[in-house]
Each structure stands twice: as structure tokens, then as C-alpha cells.
Amino acid sequence: MDNLKLLEEAKKARLKAYTPYSNFKVGAALLTKSGKVYLGCNIENATYTPTNCAERTAFFKAVSEGEREFEKIAIVGAKDGEDANEMCAPCGVCRQVMMEFCNPKEFQIILADGENTCRVMTLEEL
């Protein structure tokens, strides 16, 4: 799947985010090496500690379905009502989850960088 198409999937996932506290909605689309795409959105909680990021939601869905090999992830984020066209990098906890399951030299992270453009980097480069 091409990077811009994967970003479009992440934008769809972002629409399902539950963010009553920050109003910052994030979507992620995780492509497995088997070709399946798993979507995730951020899900907030009033105490913040149990809040789950979009990236981890996508990974946990995939792992719970038996996936263990991943190719790349597209991530988008913005305030509710805004276009998700600016870079939104994964937090440290999400990076650690990626390190657990992915080769940092190969796993690609795709971030929106404009309406129809993106930046691509490996987990190691991030």
C-alpha cells in the first residue's frame, strides 16, 4: 500500500477518536507484512494514565489478531475540527511498543507533512 493511501486510512481512524479532555484527535494505520491494515485512534480517560494512543491501539489490535510482523505505520493528528496535515510523531511509550515488535532499521513511520505530502523515516531515524 502506498504511503498516501495509508495516511488516508489513518485520517479515517482519527474520526473515531474519543478525546473529550484534549480535543486532540490522532489516527494511525498499521500495515502488516501480510498486507492487512489495522486502524487505531486515541482514547482518553479523565485520569490520563489509562489513556491509549492511536499507535498502540493499532498495534494491540493487530497483535491480538495474531500479527507479529509489521511494515509501516501512518500517523495523523490535529485538534478537533482541524485538518490533520501537520506532523504528529509518536510518543515515547508508543516508540517503545514499536521497538518491541519491529526492526528499527526497517520499520517505517509515515507522518503527514502537508495536504498531499508526507515524511517517511525509519523507527531508528526517529
Regions found by a protein language model. Give the residues of each.
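Short Gly/Pro-enriched turn/cap motifs at secondary-structure boundaries
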Residues: T19-Y21
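Short beta-strand scaffold segments in enzyme catalytic cores
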Residues: N23-L31
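C-terminal binding/interaction regions
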Residues: D2-K16, E67-L126
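Alpha-helix C-terminal capping segments
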Residues: L31, K61-E67
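Compact, glycine-rich, soluble single-domain proteins
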Residues: N42-R56
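Short, well-ordered amphipathic alpha-helical segments that serve as non-catalytic structural scaffolds
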Residues: E9-K12, A54-A62
